[in-house]
Amino acid sequence: MPLKRTSWLLLILAQSLLAHSGEPVQPHDLWGAWTFDPGVVIPLVICAFLYYLGIYQSKVIPRVQIVAFTAGLLSLALALISPLHALGEALFSAHMLQHEILMLVSAPLLVLGRPLVPFLWALPMSWRRRIGQAVKTAPVRSIWDTITRPLIAWTIELVALWAWHAPVLFEKTLTSESVHAAQHISFLFASLLFWWAVFQGGDRRMGYGMSVIYIFTTGVHSTILGALLTLSPNLWYPGYANTTGAWGLTALQDQQIGGLIMWVPAGVVFLVAALWLFSLWLDESKFRMAQAGAGNRI
């Protein structure tokens, strides 16, 4: 039995290497095109190990946070390890789906999972003290407070999204693994900052009403980009011109599908998030009004 399992693992690894030999994945090779890049797998394993060790050590992490973080980590694996990653080298639409998972599924779920506390609990006490002292220093506090300001985080997310979809940069991701990795890292980093600011990161610097506004405006500018990709009569990314035919699509049709993914499903995610925060805002307003009424009666 172990030999059989090992054989299957070696087969999957071999197919993965063949799928990334410089040629775009073909339909008959898709399900074997898993991407076991150590630069992706090792950080995911380390994050999972630290998080669940921290949960075991602390025993105080709410279940809803554990579920959110687990779902976020699994969605990262789906985007970066599953055949979707290899398919993104052949189809722009798959590439867009991958990006939407990173920015609109993984990032908010990881933020809702609040992993910093479990990560700290997983470390030795001496390390925790040193990290605690380091984050309290003025330079670190200043940098963190700056990049997590709602307007700054919103701007970073906007710049990352629009800059990387400029043809001159996007085309480089199709020919350079390092540029492609930089794109994914910047998308995830910018989205983590944005959702951290939107969900307030635990410090309530921004009310729920402002959170709704930032989500709404982010939804608007991403929808505009999706609409431009969908409605454009011109091909933005010629790098896909010779890779979509095997999948029964022209490059322009593939681009239109990718634009629709950014336009419609992504718009739904922003709408749901905005409605949820709007309901929290109403509850918060009612609570404050009730408190004010009780104070007046006293």
Cite the ranges covered by each PLM segment.
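Alpha-helical membrane segments of multi-pass proteins
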Residues: 15-298
